[in-house]
Amino acid sequence: MCYAYAALAEGAPFVMGAPNTTVDIPAMWELAEKTHMPIAGKDFKTGQTLVKSGFAPIIGTRCLGLNGWFSTNILGNRDGLVLDEPANFHTKEVSKLSTLESILVADEQPDLYTDYYHKVRINYYPPRGDSKEGWDNIDIFGWMGYPMQVKINFLCRDSILAAPLCLDLVLLIDAAARDGRYGT
């Protein structure tokens, strides 16, 4: 939040790519309005959340039920080290857990999405370096309650997946600021 405040107070736009609430609070919206500066971003969804955002709609579209989704990441870079601390992991965990709730809506399909188990873990593993490995175990059920499983092993680099999004947002927020647009 300090960086967002400092940027806006100095008359500079602010872009956030991490899954936290830095720009999701009324005080930041008010400051952006007051300083006539644009703010953007929340979660670039470059790893496991990207997988969930892509695969959960398949489950919903096919009206498959969900019994559980277990996700774990191993990271070897500074992100992994920081997120290995429970206090630092909490915001990321909330973001990752809310992804399924926003796609597989229990009120719309209570028999399929009301009572599933969802667990998210991030582990620091220095040999992995800047690479990230995400493992997802998804327990689903189909017609007549027939149980099935999906296993996903996603090896990626956050920096490679995030860089194009970051560059696009920087260009867009610069264009917005030059055009006199501000706020969220």
Model regions and ranges:
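C-terminal active-site/capping subdomain that shapes the small-molecule cofactor and substrate pocket
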Residues: 141-184
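Charge-patterned, long linear interaction tracts outside catalytic cores
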Residues: 94-156
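Structural motif
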Residues: 12-14, 37-38, 64-65, 137, ...
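N-terminal Rossmann-like NAD(P) cofactor-binding subdomain of oxidoreductases
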Residues: 1-53, 57
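Glycine-rich beta-alpha junction loops
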Residues: 45-47, 70-77, 131, 142-146, ...
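Conserved anion/nucleotide-ligand pocket segment
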Residues: 40-42, 46-115
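Conserved active-site and cofactor/substrate-binding residues in soluble primary-metabolism enzymes
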Residues: 2, 23, 49, 53, ...
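Generic secondary-structure signature for well-ordered alpha-helical cores
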Residues: 33, 37, 56-64, 145, ...
